[in-house]
Amino acid sequence: MNILKISKQTLRNNIKIIREYIGNAKMCFPVKANAYGHGIEDIVENTHDLVDFFAVANSLEAFRVTAVAKNPVLVFGVIYYEYIEKMISENIRVSIQDYEYIEKLEQIAKELDKKVYAHININTGMNRMGVDYNDACRTIQRAYESDWLILEGVYSHLACADNRDHPTNIKQKNRFDSIVKFTKGLSQDIICHLSNSYGFLGQKGICYDMVRPGILSYGFLPEFYVDRVIREIKPIARLLSKVVKIITLQEGEGVGYSLIYRGFEGEQLAVIPIGYGDGFPRELGDRGFVNINDVMYPMAGRMSMDGLTVSLGINEYDVKVGDTVELISAIPRNRNSAFSIAKQTNTIEYDIMSTLNNRIIRKII
């Protein structure tokens, strides 16, 4: 059995640290992609009293949140019309991505005789989604004056927040500042928000009315940030499995597909029942590390869909079937932390955690 064990205490402590850091700004907690792989229902259930909003990528994720919490939920992505009636009935916040979408929302709201809560996404430079910057004020004005929309928020997203010195950050901030000025001229109550984790850590004066700290809440810090308070944030999860078999190699034998790993006579290998079919990175095969009984062991041979093997050498520490295996550590400096795994596989921690799928059990401890 493969289990992602999540520390409730660490999770809640991370959020409390963030809330202290951001002062009076509201906190919108992103739980998209199954709460970055940690399990959306468990994460929401254990944090809803600490945050103001939750944010997700689509309608189906939003329904999973509203099933366990009453907090406002903002959907970042495009809305699918087959779900829009349920979204409106549950007061799920819709993102307006272009001017024309306002009229479509109004028509549906009239049919339901219920107003729609909306946030307008402005493209200030990421060039992915959102109302064009040059059309922002017209769109905001139109939504604000609508009889069927409640314009609750206006937001944008930084393209280069992970590089705090990138000139695009200032360009986007300046554009957003002008939008904020226009928006606040209509109503001081409209929530303006721009920053994700890297954004409000790397840029000054960028919290506005609300921040959206996703990866930071789960315990992953940008390398550039050394603030003492924020450094108290810790990863919340460990991925664990069990040794299911010990194999002893004979002379000239190898292990796994294509037998790319060739061991020595008498070498012992531990078989672990987790593979890329569980969302664990296949690239780690033959170069990753796992922790068994506080000893690091290297992976040996190619990872398969349902399993991997690690070399125990001569097994001087007497690893046995049933021993616990730590595949992802909650200690960032360890060779099997999500940070280290991301470095080894040329990706980011978001990727490592969010691709862990439902073959892995999530357990809050």
Curated annotation (Swiss-Prot):
Substrate binds at residues 128, 305. CDD domains: PLPDE_III_AR. It is an enzyme of class 5 (isomerase). Its cofactor is pyridoxal 5'-phosphate. Pathway: Amino-acid biosynthesis; D-alanine biosynthesis; D-alanine from L-alanine: step 1/1. GO terms for biological process: D-alanine biosynthetic process. Keywords: Isomerase, Pyridoxal phosphate. Catalyzes the interconversion of L-alanine and D-alanine. May also act on other amino acids. One of its GO terms (cellular component) is cytosol. It holds the Pfam family Ala_racemase_N. This is Alanine racemase. Its EC number is 5.1.1.1. It catalyses: L-alanine = D-alanine. The keyword Isomerase applies. Belongs to the alanine racemase family. The modification N6-(pyridoxal phosphate)lysine is found at residue 32. NCBIfam families: alr. GO terms for molecular function: alanine racemase activity; pyridoxal phosphate binding. The keyword Isomerase applies. The active site is at 32 (proton acceptor), 257 (proton acceptor).
